């Protein structure tokens, strides 16, 4: 890719405009799209954005209402629309997006109906025509307020892609003296943090609205990242992501800044304003939008998330903000540090990733009635293909085999195909399987999701 990159930005909100200016400053050719002709006309004429005081949009940043103009022939296509508009935007832009396109998503959220992250939604929508199997998706996330980026205040962010070379390409495009960009291959972890931290930030805001101080704020932030981590490890994310910019970094800035709509909304709720009215006053509150998906994920993966659960109860009107604080403070006593089996099993994958490996979710299928030396060797080699290994167990009388498999350090999850209500392809989508490892002679399952790669050992 040349130093001067052509970039199309889908979305003309504060983040899209702030990034358009930053990318133009880096010497790139930038075109911004909005579905509103009136907004495009105003941006083109005034070269200002009311929500970003002091920002002047360069004359050579182009504006358009035409999807073909913004999407065709671009080196990078950036999705900067709200999370609820990602699927519709991807569907509309699909005819103009070539296969192999680098797509960067900056929206944060989980789609409630499918429990997909934003890059997964984009891939799912683009793949429906069977002609977009090789798009390169990047999640760009971290502690980034558009208001500060627009004023060239120092900021750091994460470029996450399963292909490190693509992550580094995006890193180079965004990096400058005011924007330091890091890379990560744990895309799911980065996106999960971006969605879940909004809920935890709501809790911090509610606490502040109740008049609580810094002690409570610090406790909620710390325990908030702990419960996000518990969920992420169950989903196969890398543990270190939660202690990084996309995890604790983004949570801190969202939970403490008045730039944050989640924090401001929480403060209003804590002060007694009904949740619906608080949202009306503040605008889009992604933390409230993320609650239905968070509750489903918590139940599906059997993870304790007391803060998120309490926020959900307040938003639904089941308890008051004051009762939420009391309920959290009077929970049964527990230890701060619990040695999770998943954390132990993740250790080898973590070390490999730090040394340059790539984190992927891997699945094997079989009866594994006899855990012979050969079977264990096969499972170990399968785990080496990615880092997080799921065994899909076939046959009957699986309880003993399931326990034996989980006792192995190389196995992270065991699914009982006889009792699961979902089909194998549905389970692969649910658990975001990226690599299916087969032994010689095993047939490839029917209706394999297009995102799953097959590897024979």
Predicted regions and their residues:
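NAD(P)-dependent Rossmann-like dehydrogenase/reductase catalytic/cofactor-binding core
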Residues: 204-208, 233-243, 247, 251-344
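NAD(P)+-binding Rossmann beta1-loop-alpha1 motif at the extreme N-terminus of oxidoreductases
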Residues: 1-56, 62-65, 92
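Internal alpha-helical scaffold of NAD(P)-dependent oxidoreductase catalytic cores
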Residues: 85, 96, 121, 128-136, ...
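Short acidic low-complexity segments
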Residues: 59-74, 348-355
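Rossmann-like NAD(P)(H) cofactor-binding subdomain of soluble oxidoreductases
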Residues: 64-152, 170
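Nucleotidyltransferase catalytic core that binds NTPs
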Residues: 344-457
């Amino acid at each position: 890719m040349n130093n001067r990159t052509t970039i199309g930005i889908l979305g003309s909100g504060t983040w899209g405009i702030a990034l358009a200016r930053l990318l133009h400053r880096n010497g790139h050719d930038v075109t911004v799209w909005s579905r509103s002709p009136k907004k495009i006309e105003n941006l083109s004429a005034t070269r200002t954005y009311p929500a970003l005081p002091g920002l002047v949009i360069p004359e050579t940043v182009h504006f358009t209402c035409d999807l073909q103009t913004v999407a065709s022939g671009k080196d990078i296509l950036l999705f900067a629309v709200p999370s609820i508009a990602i699927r519709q935007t991807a569907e509309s832009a699909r005819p103009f997006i070539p296969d192999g396109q680098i797509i960067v998503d900056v929206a944060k959220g989980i789609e409630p109906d499918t429990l997909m992250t934003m890059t997964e939604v984009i891939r799912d929508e683009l793949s429906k025509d069977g002609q977009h199997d090789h798009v390169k998706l990047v999640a760009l996330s971290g502690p980034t307020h558009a208001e500060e980026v627009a004023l060239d205040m120092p900021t750091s962010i994460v470029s996450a892609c399963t292909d490190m070379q693509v992550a580094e390409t995006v890193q180079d495009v965004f990096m400058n003296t005011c924007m330091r960009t890091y890379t990560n291959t744990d895309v799911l972890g980065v996106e999960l943090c971006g969605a879940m931290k909004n809920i935890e930030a709501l809790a911090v805001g509610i606490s502040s609205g109740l008049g609580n101080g810094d002690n409570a704020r610090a406790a909620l932030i710390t325990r908030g990242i702990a419960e996000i981590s518990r969920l992420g490890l169950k989903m196969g994310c890398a543990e270190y992501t939660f202690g990084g910019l996309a995890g604790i970094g983004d949570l801190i800035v969202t939970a403490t800044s008045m730039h944050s709509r989640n924090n401001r909304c929480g403060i209003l709720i804590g002060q007694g304003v009904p949740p619906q009215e608080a949202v009306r006053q503040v605008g889009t509150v992604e933390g409230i939008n993320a609650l239905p998906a968070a509750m489903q994920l918590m139940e599906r993966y059997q993870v304790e998330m007391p803060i998120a659960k309490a926020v959900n109860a307040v938003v639904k009107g089941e308890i008051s903000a004051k009762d939420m604080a009391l309920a959290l403070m009077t929970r049964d006593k527990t230890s701060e540090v619990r040695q999770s089996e998943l954390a132990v099993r993740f250790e080898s994958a973590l070390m490999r990733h730090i040394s340059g490996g790539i984190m992927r979710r891997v699945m094997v299928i079989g009866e594994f009635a006899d855990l012979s030396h050969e079977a264990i060797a096969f499972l170990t080699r399968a785990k080496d293909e990615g880092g997080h290994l799921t065994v899909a167990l076939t046959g009957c009388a699986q309880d003993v085999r399931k326990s034996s498999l989980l006792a192995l350090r190389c196995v992270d999850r065991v699914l009982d195909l006889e009792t699961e209500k979902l089909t194998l392809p549905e389970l692969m989508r649910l658990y975001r399987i990226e690599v299916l490892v087969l032994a010689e002679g095993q047939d490839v399952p029917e209706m394999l999701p297009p995102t799953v790669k097959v590897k024979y050992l």
